[in-house]
A protein has these predicted regions:
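A short glycine-rich, Lys/Arg-flanked "PGG" loop and its adjoining helix->strand segment in the class I
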Residues: 123-135
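A short acidic, Gly/Pro-enriched loop at the edge of an enzyme's catalytic core
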Residues: 98-109
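Conserved alpha-helix/loop element of class I SAM-dependent methyltransferases that forms part
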Residues: 27-46
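Conserved catalytic/acceptor-binding region of the Class I
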Residues: 138-202, 209-226
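N-terminal, positively charged/glycine-rich alpha-helical extensions of SAM-dependent methyltransferases
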Residues: 1-18
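Class I SAM-dependent methyltransferase SAM/SAH-binding core
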Residues: 49-99
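A short SAM/SAH-binding and catalytic strip from SAM-dependent methyltransferases
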Residues: 109-121
Length: 232
């Protein structure tokens, strides 16, 4: 297993361990996912891929509007939760966004809510999305860019030299990935979203509940010690 496969396996485990608590903690996911809805195609006889479907919350909503919906996630625990709690007539697939288990030109549009920031290398994922999209197909997504969790990142920088927050792409870097004639960025919007927490402990607990506490470059893979949290 190479280092990238190991990282993806760890990400799958992180999100899998959060499957039971994900829906009650996913304030940002709900907000951003609903903000994507006005961008969706009006035509309803379409085949849709929910890439990184998680617990299937938005997969279920998509199924109410489109002919065929596929929910794909790297975490089998997330998928099992989705199968049990959400639409039974959705096609659920375990798969890696870097190697989608789908035929060429088989999908009308791909929906993805706060997923691709975990994908590395992202250009491979974009090529896969373009491969499975039909001619004229659309990729509608939300992601996080540089500046996300900057308060948490700057606070940890005063405690130790470890990486506690993932380095997100800049808006420019993201746009440059969509620069080919076959896969061009048609329209985008960058929006600041502010969530307030009682203290940093509550923020850390929510990130863990979401499975979003995996940082590939982190030296100390365990939880920060008591002294570190007191300094925070």
């Amino acid at each position: 297993m190479d280092s990238l496969d190991f990282t993806r396996e760890n990400i799958a485990k992180s999100f899998g361990s959060a499957s039971e608590s994900y829906d009650v903690s996913a304030r940002l996911q709900r907000f951003s996912g609903k903000n994507l809805m006005p961008w969706l195609p009006k035509q309803n006889d379409l085949t849709v891929l929910d890439l990184g479907c998680g617990t299937g919350f938005f997969t279920h909503l998509l199924k109410g509007s489109y002919h065929q919906v596929i929910g794909l996630d790297i975490s089998i625990k997330m998928l099992n939760y989705a199968k049990e709690k959400k639409s039974p007539d959705v096609t659920w697939l375990k798969g890696d966004a870097h190697k989608l288990p789908l035929q060429n030109e088989s999908i009308d549009f791909v929906y993805s809510n706060l997923v691709i920031q975990w994908c590395d290398p992202l250009d491979t994922v974009i090529k896969e999305i373009c491969r499975v999209l039909k001619p004229g197909g659309t990729f509608i997504f939300s992601t996080l860019v540089e500046g996300t969790l900057h308060e948490l990142k700057s606070s940890w920088a005063q405690v130790d030299n470890d990486e506690h927050v993932i380095d997100f792409m800049t808006e420019l870097e993201l746009n440059e990935l969509f620069n080919s004639p076959k896969c061009a960025m048609l329209e985008h919007k960058c929006q600041d979203i502010v969530l307030e927490y009682e203290d940093v402990i509550h923020l850390a607990k929510e990130l863990k509940a979401l499975g979003a506490n995996h940082v590939p470059s982190q030296k100390n893979k365990g939880l920060a010690g008591k002294d570190s949290w007191l300094k925070m």
